[in-house]
Regions:
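Membrane-cytosol interface segments of multi-pass membrane proteins
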Residues: 1-158, 202
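Aromatic-enriched alpha-helical transmembrane segments of multi-pass intramembrane proteins
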Residues: 136-211
Length: 211
């Protein structure tokens, strides 16, 4: 099995694990009951549901690091693979919600598309990362952003500090890019490390050939 096929296989496995985790996260509470088995099951599902989105961001960072398209070509492709499906699916879901609850307006539609208080906030943050990391290539800069991200997560958990205030400003810790930056950065760094290993192996082979 070549490295590309192995990469694809590993990514599919990670995606399956992440999907399972997201399903667990949205399966609680199991029922309106205080029985011990229900409480325990809900806690287990909560724990299993904590790593799905981080894994997806790691995968996205890894794949983004391998991008070779120019700025215009990249976003042209994303128009068809990301934005059009996103807008169509979210608009249909929004119409369903509005038919049940009312409150149709352009502002409500735009906020819904941007995942404001909505479960698919992942796409909004992903687009933000594509812009932020477009020119960032040096591992040292990525590490600095990872450290900033860890600080943001700590402050979010402790409900204090500038990043917690940022959460309050956007009215959701899920829409704070700094809370997710670490995982996207890890994906970038893994890809950078694989690139360095590939270059080293290639040089070793060339050295053997020319001895």
């Amino acid at each position: 099995m070549n490295s590309i096929s192995k990469d694809k296989g590993n990514i599919y496995i990670l995606k399956a694990i992440a999907i399972f985790s997201v399903m667990c996260a949205h399966s609680t509470p199991l029922m309106d009951s205080n029985s011990k088995i229900n409480v325990l099951s809900s806690q287990i599902l909560d724990y299993l549901g904590t790593f799905g989105v981080p894994v997806f961001f790691c995968i996205s960072g890894y794949l983004f690091a391998g991008n070779t398209r120019a700025w215009g070509d990249f976003w042209k492709r994303k128009m068809f693979t990301l934005f059009i499906p996103w807008i169509c699916c979210e608009t249909l879901l929004w119409l369903y919600v509005m038919l049940r609850k009312g409150g149709i307006s352009i502002a409500a539609w735009l906020l819904f598309l941007l995942e404001y208080h909505h479960t698919t906030y992942y796409l909004t943050i992903l687009v933000v990362f594509y812009v932020i990391y477009w020119k960032i290539r040096k591992p040292c800069v990525i590490w600095i952003l990872n450290i900033v991200s860890m600080l943001s997560m700590v402050q979010t958990g402790w409900s204090t500090g500038i990043f917690y205030r940022f959460n309050t400003a956007v009215d959701s810790c899920y829409l704070n890019p700094f809370n997710w930056m670490l995982f996207f950065g890890i994906g970038l760094l893994i890809h950078r490390q694989k690139e360095r290993e590939s270059i080293r192996k290639l040089r070793d082979r060339q050295g053997i050939l020319y001895r």
